[in-house]
Design a protein with these regions (language model features):
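Residue-level hotspots within pore-lining transmembrane alpha-helices
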Residues: 34, 38, 42, 71-75, ...
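N-terminal transmembrane alpha-helices
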Residues: 16-48, 52-53, 66-85, 109-117, ...
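Interfacial/gating helices of multi-pass transporter permease domains
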Residues: 50-69, 134-142, 204-209, 245-252, ...
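Transmembrane helical elements of multi-pass membrane transporters/channels
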Residues: 26-46, 146, 181, 214-218, ...
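Helix-terminus/linker motif at the lipid-water interface of multi-pass membrane proteins
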Residues: 37-59, 127-134, 191-202, 261-294, ...
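Small-residue-rich hydrophobic transmembrane alpha-helices
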Residues: 58-117, 157-169, 173-174, 284-348, ...
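Short alpha-helical transmembrane segments in multi-pass integral membrane proteins
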Residues: 1-29, 86-153, 184, 191, ...
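Short runs within selected transmembrane alpha-helices of multi-pass transporters and secretion channels
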Residues: 79, 83, 147-166, 174-182, ...
Length: 482
């Protein structure tokens, strides 16, 4: 984050160099990427330890955990509005507005936990309505009945704090506490599942309890850091949550949640289509998707950093710097994914070998198919990185509703139909479905990038900052508005 000088002085000094933008964006994104990888590691830990109880426990616990993370991830999208609002305020040298955003965002997190809690409470009847086996539905319902108590902690610790901390220059605190959470989660999972370390033996429900306790621990630790460290205390001084501000945060954030949902359902539907092709294609799909998901954490973090940095310079009233911050972030995201894609093309079998025994003849078909999907993933990753960073840049401009529509069109108007036709009419199978994903992501990436180019250029030409649902410069809010 830049030194706190007046917006007028910043404008007079001129925008930072492109290399300065690159360094600042990388410094902000690096701890966010590691924190997100730590969150993935928690899920891997849960899966491994549930697997020690057998396939039934793994199936119930895995499905219950997936339901939990899908629900809270969608609602966390609403809280991304906190990040850009704080960034705008700090850019405008209006740190006195930050506590109001903090307390209002905290209250919004608690309110959002209510529908999540209710939905998870009805996991069993929901699964029965989808004709899942009664025993599985019952076990998943019991798992979610425990895990639902972690929804407020997850929305505060992962949702609210992941948005707030980078915007005040405290991303490293999120990093270290997230890494600590991995070890706490592993300790509690093993202890509560198997009754070790003097903890009660709860079986597969112990994993749900461990996750709920861990996310609450992370939330409490992050809140404590903000309130106890003198460096951050002025950002969280007591302020009354304001209903109009909560409405603004919700209005800015709900399209992001819908965008997350549109993308998630595309991948879910693609997985279901692959499942129709047989077990080997589905296994290959899961391997390729897992590899792509790990690499995706980096551009996702760069997109979050772009959200903050673009928003900061919009608040400061320096449109050239806001535009440069966005395009430098796009270059970083695409550049990383090109390097990652090169690895996938160069050593696909070695990567597949991390998941399957290459020498086992029974795995030959799956190995070959997974290696071919990694070739598609090399292209898929580049446009995936571009679209997620582009989305972050637009959030920095408080532009979320048009990107939501662009995502819906790209994913379901282009991606799914293309994949379906290639897979089942041109008989390309799983590879065709993956080319459909790539086509959908490419269309979204192009639309996001072009929109950022147009709005940021207009900001430079008019000097009027964009606002929510920006469609005309004359109707946008004055620069510096939060």
């Amino acid at each position: 984050m830049q030194p706190q000088v007046t917006p007028a002085a910043r404008a007079h000094q001129g925008p930072p160099s492109l290399s300065r933008h690159a360094v600042d964006t990388a410094r902000l994104a690096a701890p966010l990427a590691i924190a997100q990888l730590a969150q993935m590691a928690m899920g891997v830990t849960d899966t491994i330890l549930l697997g020690s109880l057998g396939p039934d426990a793994l199936a119930a616990g895995g499905l219950g955990a997936n339901l939990f993370f899908v629900v809270v991830t969608l609602l966390q999208g609403v809280l991304t509005s906190v990040s850009v609002s704080v960034a705008h305020a700090r850019g405008a040298n209006a740190d006195d507005r930050v506590p109001g955003i903090y307390w209002t965002g905290l209250m919004l997190s608690v309110l959002l936990a209510v529908p999540a809690f209710v939905l998870l409470s009805y996991a069993e009847p929901i699964l029965l309505a989808f004709h899942e086996p009664a025993t599985l539905a019952k076990n998943v319902g019991e798992y979610c009945a425990v895990l639902r108590w972690g929804t407020p902690g997850s929305l505060i610790g992962v949702g609210m704090m992941r948005a707030f901390l980078p915007a005040i220059g405290a991303a490293r605190r999120l990093l270290w506490i997230s890494i600590g959470g991995v070890f706490v989660n592993g300790f509690l999972n093993y202890g509560l599942i198997h009754g070790a370390y003097g903890l009660p033996r709860e079986g597969f429900l112990g994993s749900a309890a461990a996750t709920a306790i861990t996310v609450w621990g992370i939330a409490i630790a992050l809140v404590a850091v903000l309130h106890l460290r003198p460096r951050y205390r002025h950002f969280v001084v007591r302020a009354r949550p304001r209903l109009p501000l909560m409405g603004e945060l919700f209005g800015l954030g709900w399209p992001v949640a819908i965008t997350y949902g549109v993308e998630s359902t595309l991948f879910l539907a693609t997985g279901m289509m692959v499942g129709l092709l047989g077990e080997a294609p589905l296994a290959a799909h899961q391997i390729a998707l897992n590899v792509a998901s790990v690499a995706f954490m980096v551009p996702l973090a760069i997109g979050q950093a772009a959200n903050v940095r673009v928003g900061y310079w919009v608040g400061a009233g320096v449109p050239v710097a806001a535009r440069h911050a966005g395009f430098v972030a796009l270059a970083l995201g695409v550049g990383f994914m090109m390097c990652s894609g090169l690895v996938l093309i160069t050593v696909p079998r070695a990567i597949v070998g991390l998941y399957l025994h290459l020498d086992d003849p029974a795995n030959a078909h799956t190995v070959a198919l997974a290696a071919s999907l990694l070739g598609v993933a090399a292209v898929f990753q580049i446009v995936d990185g571009m679209q997620t960073v582009g989305s972050g840049c637009l959030r920095g401009l408080k532009d979320t509703r048009i990107p939501m529509l662009a995502a819906a069109f790209g994913y379901w108007g282009v991606g799914f139909p293309t994949g379906y036709v290639l897979a089942f009419h041109f008989e390309l199978g799983a590879k065709g479905l993956w080319w459909g994903l790539a086509a959908g992501l490419a269309s979204v990436a192009a639309l996001m990038t072009l929109r950022f180019h147009r709005i940021s250029r207009r900001f430079i030409e008019t000097g009027i900052a964009p606002g929510p649902d920006d469609t005309d410069a004359a109707s946008a809010a004055p620069h510096g508005h939060v």
